[in-house]
């Protein structure tokens, strides 16, 4: 891998060549005759390539990744696991993460997209819609465990107020209500923990990660207070793309943004085409169109059917283009977990 990084440095070639990697995946996956094993082998190769790219960028000094919050935030934890060799840039807002990627100050941005308990992060979806040069290059699931943190010496009996991000408060609402705590919203879970540490008040606690407790010298009063034991947040990696994402088919997910004509049956016609071509629609979301009252855009996430190809994906897009008012391929990627 070091030789590959050196060659790319000498020739000026990019670390990531989507078309080249897609061709390598296609060629090697075709050697697996067992159709059941083929997608697993393809996913293994894709993960190995991702690790190789991270190492190459570290050698070349090209990797900078942005996140929203402060050290200890869940976005920073996800970033650390996805890009362990990257330089990290902390941003105040999700919009600033997009700006950093758009301007080239960061090659990647890591953002929360959806939580299995609290639902969508709609602001991030809206930012994706309003940044046409940004794509989703990767998606991963991170198990979330919310802990109640306080200064040393505090107990559950001394706590009166709990501060945290609204989603963390929502995920832990049963625990909070059972103890009769007042709540105060904060912009970020890790920053809430830092605030509690600075207050040094045994009546105030934060809901945040165990990693945050270690960073800010807090104790864990109660671990795993989120109501859903399987609480998981889905994070996306965004990049600025010079070209459309490379579609390879089997083993991939496609993320699409589109608008439908404001006529009866137009949305149904688009969804019918997706099903008719064998693509499984994992989710559909609607959001208000900016500056167009009471009209909406749609986000759909599709699983490519087994044995499908890039050509099959393109055929679907061509068909949808004739049905939809606007259509944008937001991403073509694999879904993985940050904990294996």
Predicted regions and their residues:
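Domain-level signature for soluble enzymes in the chorismate/prephenate branch of the shikimate pathway
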Residues: 1-340
């Amino acid at each position: 891998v070091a030789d590959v990084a050196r060659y790319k440095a000498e020739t000026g070639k990019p670390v990531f060549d989507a078309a080249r990697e897609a061709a390598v995946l296609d060629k090697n996956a075709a050697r697996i005759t067992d159709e059941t094993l083929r997608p697993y082998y393809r996913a293994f190769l894709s993960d190995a390539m991702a690790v190789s790219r991270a190492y190459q960028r570290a050698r070349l000094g090209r990797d900078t990744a942005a996140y929203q919050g402060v050290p200890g935030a869940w976005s920073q934890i996800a970033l650390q696991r996805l890009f362990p060799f990257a330089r990290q840039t902390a941003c105040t807002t999700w919009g600033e993460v997009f700006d950093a990627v758009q301007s080239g100050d960061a090659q990647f941005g890591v953002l929360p997209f959806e939580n299995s308990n609290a639902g969508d992060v709609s602001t991030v979806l809206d930012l994706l819609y309003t940044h046409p040069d940004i794509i989703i290059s990767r998606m991963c699931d991170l198990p979330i465990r919310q802990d109640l943190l306080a200064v040393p010496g505090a107990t559950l009996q001394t706590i009166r107020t709990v501060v945290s991000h609204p989603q963390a408060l929502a995920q832990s609402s049963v625990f909070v209500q059972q103890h009769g705590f007042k709540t105060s919203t904060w912009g970020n879970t890790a920053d809430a923990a830092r605030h509690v540490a600075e207050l040094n008040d045994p009546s105030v606690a934060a809901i945040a990660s165990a990693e945050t407790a270690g960073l800010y010298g807090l104790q864990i009063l109660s671990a795993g207070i989120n109501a859903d034991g399987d609480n998981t947040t889905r994070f996306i990696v965004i990049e600025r793309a010079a070209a459309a994402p490379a579609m390879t088919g089997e083993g991939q997910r496609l993320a699409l943004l589109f608008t439908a004509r404001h006529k009866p049956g137009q949305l149904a016609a688009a969804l019918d085409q997706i099903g008719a071509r064998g693509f499984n629609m994992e989710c559909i979301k609607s959001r208000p169109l900016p500056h167009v009252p009471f009209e909406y855009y749609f986000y759909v996430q599709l699983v490519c059917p087994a044995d499908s190809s890039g050509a099959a994906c393109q055929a679907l897009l061509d068909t949808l283009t004739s049905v939809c008012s606007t259509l944008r391929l937001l991403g073509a990627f694999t879904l993985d977990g940050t904990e294996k």
